């Protein structure tokens, strides 16, 4: 178990990403930049200190972070009106002395390195819950297949101990990374964000061609279990044409070989984390009526179901997903 991964979170007792009660590892690094992403700390592989300025005691009152930083006043710590407001990552060396010195927890480190064995020690703690609920381990991100060697070894270790494995991937990776995971993955979860390639590039930073091609190839594998998701975003992909084209793709290009299609309603989440990382939250000004939007999603779900695609609103119903 020599591979080392970079993660930004481990969640125990999750129930949304795969069947049963699960432990979910979130790996850092993603090839896309979706505007609605709720986990900006997962976009880069780099371990980053984030700033929660409201907690800062002040440069004059405290200033311990500045004293601890090897670069001092000319370093990456940026103050405004006596408060630490951001960290210049171009200057930051990643020593994390600022975080270690802060008594108010105004600096949070996003990310840590972990070996497969260390991850397995976390996973084994909940083995009894997996067995009783039909649960297991999910690896998400970021994009877990950017760290395919680590993810493959982790899943192989889980398999050896009888633990169900689920990979939640953007599929914006080469087929060789996916192929490496096939023998050790019990369930796949992937998104179809939108069908228009230029609009996909505008809102995610990349074309959807690679994703769609990988989905077609996955659908050709006998017995492969795949949950598809559409994150439904107001004013972005919630139009009738996009939903119709998505259904056409599933039925014609994937031959309907999808276990479940899940429609996930947009939630305004992660804004505080964007601020901590000095990044703009691009969905801040999105306005919509929640009740109307939910009815719209329900209508889309009924239309997908009417075309023979098993469709849920949300992720909570778990029926034949268990292996």
What are these regions (language model features)?
Residues 1-63, 71-73, 92, 323:
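Flexible, acidic/Gly-rich N-terminal and inter-domain linker regions that tether
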Residues 1-19, 234-323:
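Auxiliary Fe-S-binding modules of radical SAM enzymes
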Residues 28, 32-40, 46-47, 67, ...:
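Glycine/serine-rich loop-strand microenvironments at binding/catalytic pocket rims
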Residues 36, 45-48, 148, 239, ...:
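Generic domain-boundary/flexible-linker signal
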Residues 44-184:
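Conserved Radical SAM active-site core
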Residues 70, 103, 216, 298-305:
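Class I S-adenosyl-L-methionine
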Residues 117-276:
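Conserved AdoMet/S-adenosylmethionine-binding subsite of the radical SAM
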């Amino acid at each position: 178990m020599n591979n080392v991964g970079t993660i930004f979170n481990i969640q125990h007792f999750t129930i949304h990403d795969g069947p049963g009660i699960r432990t979910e590892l979130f790996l850092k690094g993603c090839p896309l930049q979706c505007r609605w992403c709720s986990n900006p700390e997962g976009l880069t592989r780099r371990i980053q200190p984030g700033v929660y300025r409201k907690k800062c005691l002040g440069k004059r009152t405290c200033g311990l972070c500045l004293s601890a930083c090897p670069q001092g006043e000319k370093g990456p710590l940026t103050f405004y009106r006596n408060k630490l407001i951001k960290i210049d990552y171009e200057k930051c060396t990643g020593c994390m002395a600022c975080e270690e010195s802060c008594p108010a927890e105004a600096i949070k480190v996003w990310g840590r390195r972990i070996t497969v064995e260390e991850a397995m020690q976390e996973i084994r703690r909940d083995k009894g819950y997996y067995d009783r609920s039909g649960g297991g381990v999910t690896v998400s991100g970021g994009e877990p297949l950017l760290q395919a060697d680590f993810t493959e070894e982790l899943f192989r270790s889980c398999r050896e101990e009888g633990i169900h494995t689920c990979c939640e991937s953007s599929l914006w990776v080469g087929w060789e990374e996916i192929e490496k995971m096939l023998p050790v993955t019990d369930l796949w979860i992937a998104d179809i964000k939108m069908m228009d390639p230029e609009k996909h590039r505008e809102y995610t930073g990349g074309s959807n061609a690679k994703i769609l091609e990988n989905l077609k190839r996955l659908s050709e594998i006998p017995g492969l279990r795949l949950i598809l998701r559409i994150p439904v975003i107001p004013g972005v992909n919630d139009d009738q044409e996009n939903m119709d084209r998505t259904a056409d793709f599933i039925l014609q290009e994937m031959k309907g070989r999808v276990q479940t299609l899940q429609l996930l309603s947009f939630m305004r989440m992660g804004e505080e984390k964007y601020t901590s990382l000095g990044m703009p939250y691009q969905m801040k000004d999105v306005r919509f009526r929640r009740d109307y939007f939910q009815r719209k999603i329900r209508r889309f779900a009924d239309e997908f179901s009417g075309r023979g695609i098993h469709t849920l609103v949300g992720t909570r119903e778990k029926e034949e997903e268990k292996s």
